[in-house]
């Protein structure tokens, strides 16, 4: 990629903006060296990393870059074996912490979206939490070592504190004793030693060592002789403290040296992540999207914006190239935005090929080019005595030497600066040569000959920048398929040039040229009208979609209200059923209690009648609930092997027998075999009948009719194996039937059958608890089971 083109397209300004989003000097240096990558694979990977970082910013917020530093100098010194300063060690620990936290930041649950490229980068992080912890534990600030850094340092500092207290007590006493000889009744410190400010005329009155003199010479700072030994002890402790601090720093630095590979790797990854997230922050700030990348020369920029133009003023442009045509000729008046269009296309390509998201709409397409050549602006060189034309031509010669089918070439005012006829002919020749090589070209021009060239040459298309003649201002919108016109006569007329001069000028233009310009104007007007109609249609569609979404949300809300009401009603019905069944079980217990107490069978009969009425009422409620949940007609006939829906438990079952004369059939639900009536069977249609399986499981034991399951089972006369099978089957039916308590009659006999049944009940999934019958229930001849 030519450095000159990169400079002309102002990619360096994008780099400077990008640096503002970094946290470290190292990341800024990465950006300084940023250039388009050498392969389409690299471009896609670096765009993907930017896209992933962009998503993470949205979903997880700011990355953990707090307190991250450029530690290259510290790493260099540690690698050489030097002892690092506390601040350098702290910064290294901060970078290690950042690397460790980043692994946590990028971690995601299985069901969440993964971040392939960033996860691959973070896999290289060593994570050195022990070193990180030791440094943070030992160092509290840039120049402050913590007491807890070592037990030796702690003891030294404690002794130092005690000595300082002793010296201060002693010197305060001396201040009071020598107060008449002192400049002020205070003590001070000179060279880490406690001294008194003695008036120079009384220096003989305070025996001691002179350490300093005031600037006026009126005061001598004297260390009293009685403090010399104490001050010496303090000085010794301070030297020991310094030596211990140096030892601690040396040990920590040695640990960095021993793990230098991990430290360097973690630091480099953190700086790379700093760079990647700077790209993502830039994309967020400039409303960028990730384009689709191809290497086939196909370009489709949708509403691209030049990132260096004020976002409140920039006009988006849409540019296509590479499919229907490979060359685009942009014509129109000066200051109309032609050059901005060239720079926008070129800069967006440089950004994308450097792994940056682009300021354009979603679904934009960018092609990977080996080279982007740009001849834009006035490159006149006074030093080299080159004219504008010569300067441009020198640049064009370089382009012609290197451009091929993998090149994007941008020409601004190709052929300008010389005789119009020769310039136009030369421009057409250059364009045609590059087109035949397969290069993709966008060129701006004033020449009508180039408009005609685009009209007659296959693979070349005209375009123009729209100009509002009413306001004499360009709109900066790009119109592909329509050649531009200079609008010189219209502009001159509106600026006040007399009509007779304009008319005379028109007479000097051939009728053919006039008709051509009128045709262009007509095409422009139609194109503008078509675009306005398209924008209006798009706005109407968006408005319609917005209204549709609003009504769909309202409908969904109403549906939720209806569903919630239905759920509440069903829940209430089930609560009634549950309470009523509990009441039925209570009645059964009352009956047994009355029997034990010796009440007449008449009382039992009345209670049984009450229980029967209650059961009938429950059955009615259950049947209504089943009908609301499972609409549809009952099956008239079934055969063995049919898969049907048993409505009472809302579950698919397999028919095992034909209906008997009462309509009862044997069906299998999972591992259980159940007798059901054909009226309770429905046609099974895929998953349509599986209405909320989680709720079904909870309601199974409530939805089976009580009248189908007896409250007791008699095992007398059965052997152990037959009894176990019978009880297991019975408990399944009792559980599904919603019975709270049942009685198993096994008789007293030898007790073998009772023991077998008791052992079985201990681990049965439907049994909450069990006990032997009480007096009046059958005693030890029965077992009473409470169902879960």
UniProtKB/Swiss-Prot annotation:
ATP binds at residues 332-339. Keywords: ATP-binding, DNA-binding, Endonuclease, Hydrolase, Nuclease, Nucleotide-binding, RNA-binding, rRNA-binding. InterPro entries: DNA_mismatch_repair_MutS_C, DNA_mismatch_repair_MutS_core, DNA_mismatch_repair_MutS_sf, MSSS, MutS, MutS2, P-loop_NTPase, Smr_dom. CDD domains: ABC_MutS2. PROSITE patterns: DNA_MISMATCH_REPAIR_2 (PS00486), SMR (PS50828). The keyword Translocase does not apply. It is an enzyme of class 3 (hydrolase). Pfam families: MSSS (PF20297), MutS_V (PF00488), Smr (PF01713). Its EC number is 3.1.-.-, 3.6.4.-. Belongs to the DNA mismatch repair MutS family. MutS2 subfamily. One of its GO terms (biological process) is mismatch repair. GO terms for molecular function: ATP binding; ATP hydrolysis activity; ATP-dependent DNA damage sensor activity; endonuclease activity; mismatched DNA binding; ribosomal large subunit binding; rRNA binding. Endonuclease that is involved in the suppression of homologous recombination and thus may have a key role in the control of bacterial genetic diversity. This is Endonuclease MutS2. Residues 713-788 form the Smr domain. Disulfide bonds: none annotated. Homodimer. Binds to stalled ribosomes, contacting rRNA. It comes from the Bacteria.
